[in-house]
Amino acid sequence: MQAYFDQLDRVRYEGSKSSNPLAFRHYNPDELVLGKRMEEHLRFAACYWHTFCWNGADMFGVGAFNRPWQQPGEALALAKRKADVAFEFFHKLHVPFYCFHDVDVSPEGASLKEYINNFAQMVDVLAGKQEESGVKLLWGTANCFTNPRYGAGAATNPDPEVFSWAATQVVTAMEATHKLGGENYVLWGGREGYETLLNTDLRQEREQLGRFMQMVVEHKHKIGFQGTLLIEPKPQEPTKHQYDYDAATVYGFLKQFGLEKEIKLNIEANHATLAGHSFHHEIATAIALGLFGSVDANRGDAQLGWDTDQFPNSVEENALVMYEILKAGGFTTGGLNFDAKVRRQSTDKYDLFYGHIGAMDTMALALKIAACMIEDGELDKRIAQRYSGWNSELGQQILKGQMSLADLAKYAQEHNLSPVHQSGRQEQLENLVNHYLFDK
């Protein structure tokens, strides 16, 4: 079959002085960073949905891209053509992983039986493509939010028959992910929330969602899937309020239903923006709670109240994110999935490469800067100094539960405590970070 991207062989690393827009300037897969290949640190993935499924339509306009596989025709044949182009893209871009929703790769069909049969055929196609290319599946998931049946949610739907349909999709998608060697399975509750409390039973919906997640965990163990289950937090859109608002909210939910040891988090940069947080905050929070799993690397727009899903281009922001990830030991089963799309006006097919190349260079440069911060150790040293009092006898007695509130009140009076505030030196530390960014 003729190549779709016929004007490009493969994207290659050419160094920072290259002016070739279809070459990497900073991402060198084989470059060693802290003793590990850059490719192994970053674990890049391209997503099926934004890259090959979105046709450029938005709230105010029809599709603008005119991709060959988005034309009228036999649904399975078009899905196979889309898979051909997708794996050509993955190969030429040098991404080791990809991600999908079930209906990204397979036609949904007119019935549950058609859905299952279509998906089974496409899983065989994908398995063959993976074997030919060496590209692996980072994670799979089920789209339980687009079809009108999910207008009031999937697991939180007031109709148990809708709940059951969603369960079928998740079973099918998880088993497909398992068959394809996927390293994670993602649960994003696109409509697991509410539009108004006037018709919503919050307690009931939380119980439904909790039971659904428990069943997902049960099925994972039943089929022997060894990958990581991931929830992807998002505060709103398409619903007004979603139950997986942010990392801290999801932690509380998991604790409520006894799932905190079974499920981790897939953190998306743009979702952090919508929740009123920095990307850095959400990553650091997930790590602090022991829930860090994977990343959807993109960016939002603080001036817009929706999920713009732009490609990451801020080295400053992502250097701090990669610093937190490296300090925590790096990715295990997770990676950096580009949940990002070209703009509607970017209608040239090679714009898909420009977006991903820039994003991969951004994250590669961020990784190298983060590695410098790790090797220098100055930030860690400053934080250790700031909290050093907790290593004292008093600090350790408090943390080990050896002193009560009344004991502390007595201690403070007996020792005539008069602590003096120590400077946080925020400005100096910001200058230090700029030194790593611009002077190293």
Curated annotation (Swiss-Prot):
Q: What class of enzyme is it?
A: isomerase
Q: Which domain of life is it from?
A: Bacteria
**Residues that coordinate or bind Mg(2+) 2:** 268, 271, 307, 309
The residues listed in the UniProt record as binding Mg(2+) 1, with positions renumbered to this chain, are 232, 268, 296, 339
Subcellular location, principal: cytoplasm
Q: Name one GO cellular component term.
A: cytoplasm
Q: Name one GO biological process term.
A: D-xylose metabolic process
Q: Cellular location of this protein?
A: Cytoplasm
The text of the family note is: Belongs to the xylose isomerase family.
- This chain belongs to which protein, by name? Xylose isomerase
Species source reads: Escherichia coli O157:H7
The gene name reads: xylA
